[in-house]
Curated annotation (Swiss-Prot):
Protein name, UniProt field: UPF0014 membrane protein YjkA
Subcellular location(s) per record: Cell membrane
Gene name in the database record: yjkA
Keywords: Cell membrane, Membrane, Transmembrane, Transmembrane helix
PANTHER family: PROTEIN ALUMINUM SENSITIVE 3, UPF0014 INNER MEMBRANE PROTEIN YBBM-RELATED
Length: 250
């Protein structure tokens, strides 16, 4: 696709702007900002990746992954609803998930240690974990607020902080994983995933594209569960005081 063809796809943005204006949705400004940011960010990352792919040095790969982790963690904690999250807890959770998934893929020689493989797969894993982290923390924050009396009752009966919040953590984990699981159930029937579509458009054999897509599906499923479990372990102690009481501002 050349830049002329790409510019013609702006028709879809104009359609969205027209509909927003017609129905008084009031999101025209957000659409314009989102479009400009997406175009600029993707073009910049495209040129950066071209340089990294040419160098293909582990240090450049590591720096790129660290940047993705930092941006993802910041995006999660900047949401006002995630009041019980912190940058370093989220960053640590995302980093652990990345280390585990990439460690397995590289140690079993499923993918080679090259930028062309590690960076795109890391982006998908971190992106999926970022969404899961946001959903999990939102759900946990809301559940703690609604079930505060239940937590305090269990604590008053001699229960530990972990016991008082275990059911809430389980519920938050289940609800935050539902979108990922439901999306995976319809792969190939309702939607063709991004990596598979991209490879097919680039001329790859469809079966080869399916293999890589299944790699992503299995990896994101594991990363989803890992993200929730690690965030549970790292986050729940922050809800309680040193005297094992629920913090009043939660």
């Amino acid at each position: 696709m050349d830049y002329l063809s790409l510019s013609l796809t702006m028709i879809f943005v104009l359609i969205a702007l027209f509909l927003s204006k017609s129905f008084k949705a009031g999101v025209e400004k957000d659409m314009i900002i989102a479009t400009i940011r997406a175009a600029v960010q993707l073009l910049i990352i495209g040129y950066v990746l071209s340089l990294i792919f040419r160098g293909d040095h582990p240090v450049f790969i590591l720096l790129m992954v660290l940047l993705m982790l930092a941006v993802a963690a910041q995006n999660v904690i900047k949401r006002k609803k995630n009041t019980i999250g912190s940058f370093w807890r989220v960053f640590a959770a995302l980093a652990i998930v990345e280390i585990v998934t990439q460690g397995i893929l590289l140690s079993l020689h499923i993918i080679p240690l090259t930028a062309r493989y590690v960076i795109p797969i890391s982006g998908m894993v971190i992106g999926n974990s970022m969404v899961l982290s946001s959903l999990f923390l939102n759900r946990l924050n809301s559940e703690v607020g609604v079930r505060k009396e239940e937590i305090q009752l269990i604590l008053s009966l001699g229960g530990t902080p972990k016991q008082s919040i275990q059911r809430i953590l389980t519920s938050a984990m289940k609800m935050s994983m539902i979108p990922t699981l439901e999306s995976q159930k319809t792969l190939g029937l309702v939607q063709l995933p991004g990596m598979m579509t991209g490879q097919i458009l680039a001329g790859a054999d469809p079966i080869q594209a399916v293999r890589f897509q299944l790699l992503i599906v299995f990896t994101t499923m594991a990363s989803a569960a890992l993200t929730c479990v690690i965030l549970s372990v790292l986050t729940y102690p922050s809800l309680f005081t040193v005297h094992q009481q629920l913090k009043q501002n939660e």
